[in-house]
UniProtKB/Swiss-Prot annotation:
InterPro entries membership: HAD-like_sf, HAD-SF_hydro_IIIA, HAD_sf, His_synth_bifunc_HisB, HisB_N, Histidinol-phos, IGPD_sf, ImidazoleglycerolP_deHydtase
Organism: Escherichia coli (strain K12)
Entry's family note: In the N-terminal section; belongs to the histidinol-phosphatase family. In the C-terminal section; belongs to the imidazoleglycerol-phosphate dehydratase family.
Localization in the cell: Cytoplasm
Protein name per Swiss-Prot or TrEMBL: Histidine biosynthesis bifunctional protein HisB
Region called Imidazoleglycerol-phosphate dehydratase, residue ranges: 167-355
GO biological process, one term: L-histidine biosynthetic process
HAMAP family: Bifunc_HisB (MF_01022), HisB (MF_00076)
Coiled coil location: none
GO molecular function, one term: identical protein binding
Annotated Mg(2+) binding sites: 9, 11, 130
Cofactor(s) needed by this chain: Mg(2+); Zn(2+)
Amino acid sequence: MSQKYLFIDRDGTLISEPPSDFQVDRFDKLAFEPGVIPELLKLQKAGYKLVMITNQDGLGTQSFPQADFDGPHNLMMQIFTSQGVQFDEVLICPHLPADECDCRKPKVKLVERYLAEQAMDRANSYVIGDRATDIQLAENMGITGLRYDRETLNWPMIGEQLTRRDRYAHVVRNTKETQIDVQVWLDREGGSKINTGVGFFDHMLDQIATHGGFRMEINVKGDLYIDDHHTVEDTGLALGEALKIALGDKRGICRFGFVLPMDECLARCALDISGRPHLEYKAEFTYQRVGDLSTEMIEHFFRSLSYTMGVTLHLKTKGKNDHHRVESLFKAFGRTLRQAIRVEGDTLPSSKGVL
């Protein structure tokens, strides 16, 4: 899996920049920006690696002796380290603008290895800095830039923005039999819109969203003039894929879930978002159809979903009424999924380190 990085400017972003000469060359000039340490700790917990990148005009010259820089800088690094903040690398350009070097921000010389490795998650990596050159660096790297400002985009705001999860996925699946469009928002409730062409199936899918505590939009055009087989099967495949994508790296999720009774039915559902597809299913129905949905396709739907979502799923129901038996399965799955996808921490719930 590619790595999320934060490339962070030093003066004016991590520590205050003296307005008189823009040099932190004495200990009394060293002051941290408000909230920087707790927010960096939060960002590390969210899986970001930190890289400091800074222009230090004329470092090592008479106007800015190396020793004057080293004292405050080393103290700053010691304080960061003592509080648990770890920088993978500190990148410094010591040149003046007149030197026309190739390593001064916004040029990308200092960060070339991150661009070449193809191991950086560009969609979720950022440059954070207080100057236009930092934003230009981000553009040159092909990632997003965040313009730090104590009032308009301070460290608590940045921490909230980058750790807030909007777990969303959009999957389009087109075959000769079906055209399916699925969108899933795991952290939003209500407003689901579902149209598969099979009315009772729409109702069942809505039960998953309602009891799962998330929103989804599903539009399906299938070969219903034949039967509902391809429509139900392919919807399960597309929905499972969307749920898997929306879960992302699964960091902090509960992972497991359980059971739900309904009316005279007792539905049992056990779910493990394990990365290992498996379905155990036990349900018997009196009739071949409930509404316009084939009862034999219910198992097929959950098997398809568990396969593409990568989950271990156990489903069982018993009761007297087919409608209630079917509905109990979908409600139980939704309620169980609600528990399993809930975020309650920052760590991956696996001793293997991968799900």
